[in-house]
C-alpha cells in the first residue's frame, strides 16, 4: 500500500492538521508541530496531545506513517557555535514534541556551511548535532531530507547523506527522505526511465533501503541542475509526470509516506487521487 498525502497547515491546533489531511483524502501527511518561524514555542499541553491523538484515531491516520517537518530555522551544521547550540536545542525540542504526540519520525533539512566552514566540517557538525539530540531523546527517528543545493545548503549529494549517516551512533534512529524536486535541481535526472533507475541505483549504492523513510513528491519549476529549490505541481514543471508513476509502482517504496509539497493546495486532492490510481 502507498501512503499518500500533503504538507498541511496546523493553524488553529495540531488536530486541525489531521482534519485537513482527511479532507483531501490523504492517508499520510506532514505538518509543523510548532510555529516554524520561531525558535521557542510553548510546550505542548496535555489537551493538545490528546486532541491530536484522538483526531488521528477518528480519521484513521497511523502515527508511524505521519512525517512531521522541523523548523527551517534549524541549522545543525551552523559554523557559529552560538547559533549551532540554538539549533541543537530547538531540534531536541522538536523531537520531544514528536515523541509526545506518538509520532515515529521527524523530517529535517541538514544545514548550511554559510561559506564559513568546509562542507566536510559542516557534515561532521551535522552528525554530531544528531548524535547529541538522539542521546537526549527517545523513540523518534531523525529523517534527513536531501536538498537542492541552493546557496550554501548541504545535503545535495548522496555522498553527503552517506557521510552524515556513517557517523551516527544509533543507526536505528536515522533515516532519509527523498525530495524529487531537490533531486532534479541538484543534478540527479528523473525524466526518463533510464535516468530514474540510474539515480536510484546511485542512491542505493551508498545508502541501504532500510534508511529510506519518506518521499516528498514535487515537480520542479526550475530547469535540471539549477540548484534552485522551486516546487511545482505534478506534471506542470520540468520533471514531468512519468517519475511519479515509477515511484508509486515500485514495490520497494510501498508503505513509505509520500508527501506532496506542490505549490497549489487546491490541486492536492486531485493529485492524491491520480497517484492512488497508479497503484
Curated annotation (Swiss-Prot):
- State the UniProt keywords alphabetically: DNA damage, DNA repair, Endonuclease, Hydrolase, Metal-binding, Nuclease, Zinc
Q: What class of enzyme is it?
A: hydrolase
Top-level taxonomic group: Bacteria
E.C. no:
3.1.21.2
Swiss-Prot/TrEMBL catalytic activity = Endonucleolytic cleavage to 5'-phosphooligonucleotide end-products
The cross-references to SMART domains, in alphabetical order and at most eight, read:
AP2Ec
State a single Gene Ontology molecular function.
Answer: deoxyribonuclease IV (phage-T4-induced) activity
Report residues binding Zn(2+) 2.
145, 179, 216, 261
Q: Which Pfam families match?
A: AP_endonuc_2 (PF01261)
- What InterPro entries does UniProt report for this protein, alphabetically? AP_endonuc_2, AP_endonuc_F2_Zn_BS, Xyl_isomerase-like_sf, Xyl_isomerase-like_TIM-brl
Cofactor binding description: Binds 3 Zn(2+) ions.
- Chain positions recorded as Zn(2+) 1 binding sites: 69, 109, 145
GO BP: base-excision repair
- Positions of Zn(2+) 3 binding: 182, 229, 231
Question: What does the record give as cofactor?
Answer: Zn(2+)
Q: What does this protein do?
A: Endonuclease IV plays a role in DNA repair. It cleaves phosphodiester bonds at apurinic or apyrimidinic (AP) sites, generating a 3'-hydroxyl group and a 5'-terminal sugar phosphate.
NCBIfam families in UniProt: nfo, PRK01060.1-4
- PANTHER family according to UniProt: APURINIC-APYRIMIDINIC ENDONUCLEASE (PTHR21445:SF0), ENDONUCLEASE IV ENDODEOXYRIBONUCLEASE IV (PTHR21445)
Family, per entry = Belongs to the AP endonuclease 2 family.
Q: What protein does this entry describe? A: Probable endonuclease 4
Which classification does the entry list for the species? Bacteria, Pseudomonadati, Pseudomonadota, Gammaproteobacteria, Enterobacterales
Amino acid at each position: 500500500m502507498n501512503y499518500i498525502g500533503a504538507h498541511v497547515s496546523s493553524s488553529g491546533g495540531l488536530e486541525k492538521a489531521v482534519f485537513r489531511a482527511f479532507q483531501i483524502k490523504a492517508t499520510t501527511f506532514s505538518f509543523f508541530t510548532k510555529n516554524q518561524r520561531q525558535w521557542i514555542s510553548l510546550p505542548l499541553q496535555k489537551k493538545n496531545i490528546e486532541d491530536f491523538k484522538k483526531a488521528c484515531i477518528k480519521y484513521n491516520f497511523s502515527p508511524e506513517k505521519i512525517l512531521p517537518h522541523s523548523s527551517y530555522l534549524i541549522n545543525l551544521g551552523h559554523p557559529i557555535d552560538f547559533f549551532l547550540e540554538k539549533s541543537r536545542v530547538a531540534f531536541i525540542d522538536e523531537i520531544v514534541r514528536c515523541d509526545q504526540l506518538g509520532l515515529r519520525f521527524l523530517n529535517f533539512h541538514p544545514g548550511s556551511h554559510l561559506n564559513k566552514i568546509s562542507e566536510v566540517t559542516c557534515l561532521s557538525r551535522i552528525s554530531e548535532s544528531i548524535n547529541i539530540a538522539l542521546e537526549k531523546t527517545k523513540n523518534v527517528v531523525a529523517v534527513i531530507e536531501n536538498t537542492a543545493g541552493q546557496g550554501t545548503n548541504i545535503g545535495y549529494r548522496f555522498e553527503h547523506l552517506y557521510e552524515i549517516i556513517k557517523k551516527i551512533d544509533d543507526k536505528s534512529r536515522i533515516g532519509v527522505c527523498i525530495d524529487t524536486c531537490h533531486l532534479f535541481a541538484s543534478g540527479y535526472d528523473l525524466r526518463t526511465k533510464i535516468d530514474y533507475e540510474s539515480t536510484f541505483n546511485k542512491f542505493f549504492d551508498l545508502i541501504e533501503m532500510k534508511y529510506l523513510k519518506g518521499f516528498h513528491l514535487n515537480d520542479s519549476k526550475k530547469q535540471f541542475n539549477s540548484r534552485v529549490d522551486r516546487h511545482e505541481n505534478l506534471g506542470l514543471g520540468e520533471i514531468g509526470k512519468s517519475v511519479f508513476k515509477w515511484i508509486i509502482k515500485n514495490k520497494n517504496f510501498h508503505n513509505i509516506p509520500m508527501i506532496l509539497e506542490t505549490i497549489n493546495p487546491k490541486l492536492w486532492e486531485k493529485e492524491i487521487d491520480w497517484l492512488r490510481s497508479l497503484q
